Amino acid sequence: MQWDSVTLKNMPGYFIEQSEVEGLDYTTMCLWAEEVELSEPRDTKGETEEAVKEILKTHSWSWLGEEGKRIQKVLTGVDEEDEMETFRAWERYLEKTLAFPFDAKVLGYQDKGPLRSGDKVSVKKISLVDDHYGIIVELRRGRKKYDHPLCDLEVINNDSINYQPVKDYRVWFANR
């Protein structure tokens, strides 16, 4: 049985979050035929679809637990279909949150350029937002200056105030 928009709009947020974390579908419920009474529809299929869209605006990252809550907070009020708008939301958040400079290491295979996985760098500032690579930061390795995607960096000091925001951005970038 699929829930209608009336039920979905009245569904407690914690139930939706728990369902997302556990990978369950909160929009339906399986019942035996004898547990259901035939009734008249209270809405249309379109209204139900619209209710689900509204729920996703506040719960689309709930499946990630606490990390998802932080990501959702950054994206509150943002049309997630507009990729540049979401990148700009991250840029605003990171500009306010990060303390520059900070030390990081390069992650993953780097097929081009002078930086390699494991290189230690000093991140100086956010340079720009790119529609393909996301947040680009200015960094230094030794005396050389480079621009590099933030999604390919990890803050070295786990206790740094920069660690969690950069990790949250990386997780969002990988799952967008």
Protein language model regions, located:
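Basic/aromatic-rich interaction segments and small domains that mediate binding to polyanionic partners
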Residues: M1-E95, F100-D168, W172-R176
